[in-house]
Regions:
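Beta-strand repeat architectures
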Residues: 329-332, 355-363, 389-392, 414-416
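Bacterial N-terminal signal peptides that target proteins for export
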Residues: 1-11
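Intrinsically disordered, low-complexity Ser/Thr- and acidic-rich flexible linkers and loops
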Residues: 336-340, 348-359
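C-terminal segment of classical bacterial N-terminal signal peptides
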Residues: 16-23
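Short beta-strand segments that buttress and anchor functional surface loops
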Residues: 316, 350, 401-403
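Carbohydrate-active catalytic/glycan-binding domains of CAZyme proteins
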Residues: 25-331, 338-345, 372-398, 407
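Hydrophobic beta-strand segments within beta-rich accessory/binding domains
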Residues: 323, 359, 399-402, 410-412
Length: 417
């Protein structure tokens, strides 16, 4: 079976994968980017834009390569779809770029993100926020939220040089709402983004230092508020205006410096988060796009782990039994010891049952599956590997599931699909 998106979404709701051996895998292609925008889907493709202009494109969400087009240069863009158009916000300078904290945030529209489309054309940029050299805020690192409760559009911006600020934009024009005043909502972070869930607004900020490869200390933290304007408070009651923030994701899996959070909703109850990692050790320390499951625990977002290739027990989450081939149980030979009699013979570990011990007893052709008590037997051990050149879905490849050491693949249907 090739484990496609639908199978994953349905299967993981009822199954738990217990890892017995592992191999981490990362996205393929050339996913090199810094300060990525929230991922957008447009006409069946995925797009994200980064610092310096340009961006990445993916046909399936797994293989990423260059080709995205975003004029204006500058830093740390973000994107949101409003109706049938895409609004892009980016920073012209700021963050110490050009020698100071003077900067501005601009917005522009496009009907499509596909540079090969005849409809591809950006509007002229509009300035919506600015900062001067001696100001206690940098106009950089834009984050966009289209509020699902009332349709209002919000822009957060700023760096650890000063305050994170919030302004309201007109969702019809992308311009700053007339008379709107900035609101300070956080300090000691940058690259903020806002999301809404179940009556709470969540402010995700990137804490720590950037732009130093494997030495970057970036991590993503979060606070929440009942009002979009704050105050944002973490799980310990600390205000983000006083440096609070609960950890969402830090370094791991030989990748350091996660920053620049973005949310992508795959389906009801299924969410992914995007970010960059300042240094991927397995890619020479380059900055790469990262995509992780976004999980929720006690009302707080936390990054899930990337699914790892390996050999697993596949366990029913509801009943706790293990998925297994429906084959005859093969008894293991062992030396019997009477419980009530003294036995001075040396203790020798039993060897586990091997595939060679049982495979000749298995029928040829298709074999049904069932659930049963897990006894770490060969008919209960499943190896899950990415399908070479098989494509993928947002943040992962398609997988094949076989009994360990065999080519007996798990099929989703009786027709071997």
């Amino acid at each position: 079976m090739i484990m496609k998106t639908k199978a994953i979404l349905l299967g993981t709701a009822a199954l738990m994968f217990v890892l017995t051996s592992e191999k981490a895998i990362a996205q393929i292609g050339t996913p090199y980017i810094h300060d990525p925008s929230t991922i957008m889907e447009c006409d069946g493709k995925y797009y994200t834009f980064g610092t310096g202009g340009g961006g990445l494109i993916s046909e399936d969400g797994w293989t990423w390569n260059g080709g995205g087009v975003r004029p204006g240069g500058g830093a740390a863009p973000d994107a949101v779809k409003i109706g049938d158009r895409y609004l892009i916000a980016y920073s012209a300078t700021g963050g110490g770029l050009g020698g100071g904290h003077s900067g501005k945030v601009l917005t522009m529209w496009n009907k499509t993100l596909d540079p090969n489309s005849p409809d591809f054309k950006y509007t002229e940029p509009i300035e919506v926020a600015s900062s001067v050299n001696d100001e206690d805020c940098d106009a950089i690192d834009a984050g966009l939220l289209l509020d699902p409760t009332d349709g209002r559009l919000w822009l957060s911006y700023g760096t650890y040089f000063g305050f994170i600020r919030l302004v309201e934009l007109d969702p019809a024009t992308g311009k700053r709402m007339e008379g709107n005043k900035e609101i300070d909502i956080a300090i000691d972070c940058e690259a903020t983004d806002l999301i809404y869930r179940d009556g709470w607004y969540y402010l995700l900020g990137t804490h720590g230092t950037c732009c130093d490869g494997p030495n970057s200390t970036y991590n993503i933290v979060v606070g929440r508020s009942r009002k979009v304007t704050g105050p944002y408070v973490d799980n310990m009651g600390r205000k983000m205006l006083e440096g609070g923030g609960k950890m969402v994701i830090a370094a791991g899996n030989r990748q350091t410096g996660p920053g620049h959070f973005g949310l992508f909703k795959v389906a009801d109850g299924v969410e992914k988060m995007s970010c960059h990692f300042e240094a991927d050790f397995d890619r020479g320390g380059r900055s790469v796009l990262g995509i992780r499951p976004l999980l929720w625990k006690n009302g707080w977002p936390v990054a899930g782990e990337v699914f790892k290739e390996g050999t697993y027990e596949i366990e029913s989450e509801r009943r706790g039994y293990a998925l297994e081939l429906a084959v005859d149980f093969v008894r293991m030979e062992y030396t019997r010891h009477r419980f009530w009699e003294k036995d001075d013979t040396p203790v020798v570990p039993l060897k586990s049952q091997t595939l060679e011990d049982v495979i000749e007893t298995w029928p040829q052709g298709k074999i049904n599956v069932r659930i049963g008590d897990y006894m770490f037997r060969p008919h209960q051990k499943w190896t899950i590997t990415a399908v070479p050149d098989g494509g993928g879905y947002l943040g992962g490849p398609y997988y094949k599931i076989v009994i360990e050491g065999t080519n007996r693949a798990l099929a989703a249907t009786a027709d071997a699909e």
